[in-house]
A protein has these predicted regions:
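Conserved P-loop NTPase/AAA+ ATPase motor core
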Residues: 245-246, 252-332
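Flexible beta-alpha connector loops of hexameric P-loop NTPases
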Residues: 50-52, 78, 104-107, 125-134, ...
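Structural recognition of the conserved hydrophobic beta-strand(s) that form the central parallel beta-sheet
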Residues: 105-107, 130-132, 153-154, 191-198, ...
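Phosphate-binding/switch region of NTP-binding enzymes
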Residues: 180-270
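The Walker A/P-loop phosphate-binding site
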Residues: 25-122, 141, 145
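Phosphate-binding/switch loop-helix module in NTP-utilizing enzymes
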Residues: 131-190
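Short hinge/gating elements
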Residues: 45-48, 79, 102, 162-169, ...
Length: 332
């Protein structure tokens, strides 16, 4: 390991000011930390332009992305198994391809025949989306360089491995290095890269935390497997807001955007029902009508308050505020 020696400037300055580190003669040139300095540019001298966006063809996805995909952007989307991530991206790739943009779908979890069968089930006939069933990073990068797609999907990043590392696919080192190579490729070529990520039992994205810091946008695709409705939200977006949500409905022909999500959050009563009220909440720029239903039974000496979808401590605080300041006693 080469050693650095400290050289003092003339004039007798022996403190930190005036001292510098000098590379000793004979130091190998292969060390990045000893590379020559690069020219710098003042921030005010850099020309900044608005980011151009390309609509994905799915309005609800575009709403969350901020208007569409960005050239050279890297998007990470995670969700539970079977929630519809691959279906969503396959539909988006087909819409982009039909609009005239070349696309590439790299699958590491399914064979080409399985993806083709799913596309036919979704009613995507005659799709010209380029498909590659591969998990080796070097082959994926070579294919991207040859095909030159505008948008490339990697499904999923946990299945990709590099021959430069000896660890197994899905390990922390493999996920970190493969994502870093794909990110550098996207920034240098202007190709939009969408990475599909696995989630843990707790619902967090699997793999190193640096993966979320590395990409430009992090999306979560969530929903109840017993319900046909799905929500997509952004928790990080360098090119747009993070408080927007998109609503989809899973049908036999794939995911369909829900233009009026308030209708699915309200029960259809012909007349007012006791214990039910409707309130308005704002998700990003979209106002939503939601229905709150309360079931109150005669309690014993120590009644319990239970809630579904709302933290019980927050519920207790809200009831205390209503009791103290609004005079609403939510009790027997």
């Amino acid at each position: 390991m080469p050693q650095l020696r400290r050289v003092e400037q003339p004039g007798g300055n022996r403190g930190r000011v005036g001292q510098r580190w000098q590379k000793p003669p004979g130091t190998p040139q292969g060390y990045a930390g000893l590379a020559n300095a690069q020219p710098v540019t003042p921030l005010a001298a850099i020309e900044a332009q608005d980011v151009a966006r390309t609509p994905s063809g799915l309005s609800e996805l575009d709403r969350v992305l901020g208007g569409g995909v960005v050239e050279g952007g890297v998007v990470l989307i995670g969700g539970d198994p079977g929630i519809g991530k691959s279906t969503l991206l396959l539909q988006a790739m087909d819409a982009l391809q039909r609009s005239g943009l070349p696309t590439l779908y790299v699958t590491g979890e399914e064979s080409g025949a399985q993806v083709a069968l799913r596309s036919r089930r979704l009613g995507i006939e005659g799709s010209q989306v380029n498909l590659l069933a591969e998990i080796q990073l070097e082959k994926i990068l070579a294919t991207i360089d040859a095909v030159q797609p505008a948008v490339a999907v990697i499904d999923s990043i946990q299945t990709v491995y590099s021959d430069q590392l000896s660890s197994a696919p899905g390990s922390v080192a493999q996920v970190r290095e493969c994502a870093a190579h794909l990110t550098r490729m996207a920034k240098s070529t202007g190709i939009t890269v969408i990475l599909v990520g696995h989630v843990t039992k707790e619902g967090a994205l699997a793999g190193p935390r640096v993966l979320e810091h590395m990409v430009d946008t992090v999306l979560y695709f969530e929903g109840d497997t017993h319900s046909p409705h799905r929500l997509i939200r952004a928790i990080k977006n360098r090119f747009g807001a993070v408080n927007e949500i998109g609503v989809f409905a899973m049908t036999e022909k794939g995911l369909k955007g829900v233009s009026n999500p308030s209708a699915i959050f309200l029960s259809q009563h012909s007349e007012p029902v006791p214990g039910s009220c409707v309130m308005v909440t704002l998700e990003g720029t979209r106002p939503l009508l939601v229905e709150i239903q309360a079931l109150v039974d005669s309690g014993g000496p120590s009644p319990r308050r239970l809630s579904v979808g709302l933290d019980k401590d927050r519920l207790a605080m809200l009831l205390a505020v209503l009791h103290r300041h609004a005079g609403v006693a939510c009790m027997d």
